[in-house]
UniProtKB/Swiss-Prot annotation:
Organism annotation: Mus musculus
Pfam families: Ribosomal_L4
Record's keyword annotation contains Ribonucleoprotein: yes
Protein name (database record): Large ribosomal subunit protein uL4m
Predominant place of localization: mitochondrion
Organism taxonomic ancestry: Eukaryota, Metazoa, Chordata, Craniata, Vertebrata
Residues covered by region (Disordered): 119-139
Residues bearing PTM Omega-N-methylarginine: R147
Subunit structure, interactors included: Component of the mitochondrial ribosome large subunit (39S) which comprises a 16S rRNA and about 50 distinct proteins. Interacts with MIEF1 upstream open reading frame protein.
């Protein structure tokens, strides 16, 4: 029995050893068959824009794809480095809500207007004598107590709902909106807004091919630098809007599903928004909030 047990143990050790050696041999062969994926961002795709502004030591620039509008297949032509303090901020949705409500109230005017007892026609005489009739005393039939009389404490339009929101809150709202758009893959960066044709159908088919949604907001640096083809193409489309970078706002970004920025507009937005973080408390009257812009 002892000899049988020793022989069986030797056979099992030989089998297990051969299995281990065979598995190790297979594991050594697998890396030769399966090649590791290369970092396409570092080897193949060029960096078309580098963030030249100062970045905190504990943060790194955010990388995003740069696309082209000159063709359907030119979806990714390179990379762009974005400043993390503008395109990677904390998602303060309460700030976005404050800025959006402020923008809507900024242009809101109520024209509701009611007449007081002095403006309603009639009621010049006392309806009945003060005493003796048994009825309640009244001095005019146009009193607010009467039907058809004037309104007490009614709206006296036009009424403006304008109020001033702090400049840094507005800048933070823009940063949060840009960050949310980028994280939701609704922010696309292009090298320019050059189109091969001025046909609106080309722009519509391009947006459908790239799944940009039902509404697109195109942003360029200035009106003068906007290409003629994109101006002609967007003029006949209700779902495409074209604005300069200085007019970009939170309400427009929330209203449109996709935001398209050019490389010069990205540099402009980073410069202006980061300047708000380091600006000194203004010594001038607040009625001139833009007088110290760089």
């Amino acid at each position: 029995m002892l000899r049988l047990f020793q022989a069986a143990s030797r056979a099992s050790l030989r089998l297990s050893g051969s299995r281990v050696i065979h598995s190790l041999a297979e594991g050594a062969e697998r890396p030769a068959e399966i090649s590791e994926p290369r970092d396409s961002a570092g080897l193949l795709d060029p960096v078309l824009r580098k963030c030249e502004l100062r970045i905190p030591v504990h943060r790194r620039p955010v990388q995003a794809w740069v696309e082209s509008l000159r063709g359907f297949e030119q979806e990714r032509i390179g990379l762009a480095e974005l400043h993390p303090d503008v395109f990677a901020t904390a998602p303060r949705l309460d700030i976005v809500h404050q800025v959006a409500i402020w923008q809507r109230n900024f242009r809101r005017i109520s024209y509701a207007n009611t007449k007081t007892r002095a403006e309603v026609s009639g009621g010049g005489r006392k309806p009945w004598q003060q005493k003796g009739s048994g009825r309640a005393r009244h001095g005019s039939i146009r009193s607010p107590l009467w039907r058809g009389g004037g309104v007490a404490h009614g709206p006296r339009g036009p009424t403006s709902y304008y109020y001033m929101l702090p400049m840094k809150v507005r800048a933070l709202g823009l940063k949060v909106a840009l960050t949310v758009k980028l994280m939701q893959d609704d922010l696309h960066i292009v090298d320019s807004l050059e189109l091969p044709t001025a046909d609106p159908q080309y722009l519509t088919e391009l947006a459908q091919y790239r799944h940009w949604g039902s509404s697109v907001l195109l942003v360029d640096l200035t009106h003068e630098e906007m290409p003629k083809n994109v101006v002609a193409a967007t003029s006949g489309l209700n779902s495409f809007n074209l604005i300069p970078a200085v007019g970009l706002n939170v309400y427009s970004m929330l209203k449109h599903q996709t935001l398209v920025l050019t490389l010069p507009s990205v540099a402009f937005l980073e410069d202006k928004l980061l300047w708000q973080d380091s600006r000194y408390t203004p010594l001038y009257p607040f009625r001139l909030p833009y007088s110290d812009f760089p």
